């Protein structure tokens, strides 16, 4: 099999000592350990030999049928999604490395959707103000969003339920949008966010609505491990956005942070583009594979 999209011909694999098989069934037939990037389909699960080991980026809390199939076939499964975000596990933290790529690419896609410049321009014909970009979620993807948008010259704001990321956001040149809170409502384990209280959510929605109405581009990255993506942008908020603005929803695979997001599709609502493109890292396959 030739992986042309990643610019690695069969010969590269053969030079590294691999044997090229005719199809997936032949590849899996006598394997003791199977490595796969994307989550397996149930049809692909049928090809995995009983008693083997399987390593992939599948989500055990969402892909229940795949987990059952592993159990029924006595297959030892390793989910790269469950690797903790710690210093010791950093070299194996595929989730963070791929999120970094998604953050970078989402800004470029967002800029392509906009009918305006990203940077401030001062020309003989007049002055063009910078685009206003709002990032919802300042994890690995969100921080890369900020860095990339700033390099393109945009005016960037970022929101996160974890107050401790304020310093990281500001160090990249963005303004941190913060909900007043007496506790650590959104602080979870391993540097991830957790479910917040109803009172916090209400104040959060009010704050986001104010800032989203002024934004040209909104990129959402908020995820909670093992749960559907939190709803941050309601239809009412989208209706309040400027025509020509855009939303890039990086949480589309987990249900989306925007109420109107349709996974794998780009739609337009009330003049606002909502991009639910899935698996952005695969569009930068060379570095996605390298990392």
Q: Predicted regions span which residues?
A:
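Glycine-rich NAD(P)-binding loop of Rossmann-like domains
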Residues: 116-144
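Rossmann-fold NAD(P)-binding glycine/threonine-rich loop
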Residues: 61-87, 227-279
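Conserved small/polar residues in nucleotide/adenosyl-binding loops
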Residues: 1-5
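Conserved acidic E/D residue at the C-terminus of a beta-strand in Rossmann-like folds
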Residues: 159-163
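Glycine/threonine-rich flexible loop motifs
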Residues: 43-47, 56, 223-233, 258-259
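A structured beta-alpha segment of the ubiquitous adenosine-cofactor-binding alpha/beta core
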Residues: 17-32, 39-40, 186-218, 222-235, ...
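Adenosine-phosphate binding glycine-rich loop
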Residues: 81-82, 87-124, 252, 258-291
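Phosphate/diphosphate ligand-binding glycine-rich loop within oxidoreductases
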Residues: 28-29, 33-111
């Amino acid at each position: 099999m030739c992986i042309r999209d990643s610019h690695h011909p069969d010969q590269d694999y053969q030079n590294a000592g691999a044997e090229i098989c005719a199809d997936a069934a032949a590849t899996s037939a006598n394997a003791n350990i199977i490595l796969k990037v994307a989550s397996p389909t149930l049809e692909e699960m049928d090809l995995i030999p009983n008693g083997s080991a399987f390593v992939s980026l599948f989500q055990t809390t969402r892909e229940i049928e795949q987990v059952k199939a592993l159990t029924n076939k006595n297959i030892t499964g390793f989910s790269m999604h469950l690797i903790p975000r710690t210093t010791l596990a950093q070299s194996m933290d595929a989730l963070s490395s791929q999120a970094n790529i998604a953050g970078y690419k989402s800004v470029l896609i967002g800029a392509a959707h906009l009918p305006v410049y990203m940077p401030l321009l001062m020309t003989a014909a007049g002055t063009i103000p910078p685009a206003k970009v709002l990032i919802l979620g300042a994890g690995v993807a969100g921080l890369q969003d900020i860095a990339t948008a700033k390099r393109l010259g945009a005016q960037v704001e970022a929101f996160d339920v974890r107050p401790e990321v304020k310093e990281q956001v500001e160090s990249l040149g963005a303004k941190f949008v913060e909900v007043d809170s007496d506790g650590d409502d959104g602080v979870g384990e391993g540097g991830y966010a957790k479910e917040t209280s109803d009172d916090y959510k209400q104040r959060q929605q009010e704050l986001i609505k104010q800032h989203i109405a002024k934004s040209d581009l909104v990129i959402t990255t908020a995820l909670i491990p093992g749960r559907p993506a939190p709803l941050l942008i309601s239809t009412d908020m989208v209706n309040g956005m400027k025509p020509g603005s855009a939303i890039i929803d990086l949480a589309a695979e987990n249900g989306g942070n925007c109420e109107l997001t349709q996974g794998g599709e780009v739609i337009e609502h009330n003049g606002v583009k909502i991009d639910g493109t899935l698996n952005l890292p695969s569009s930068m396959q060379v570095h996605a594979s390298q990392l």
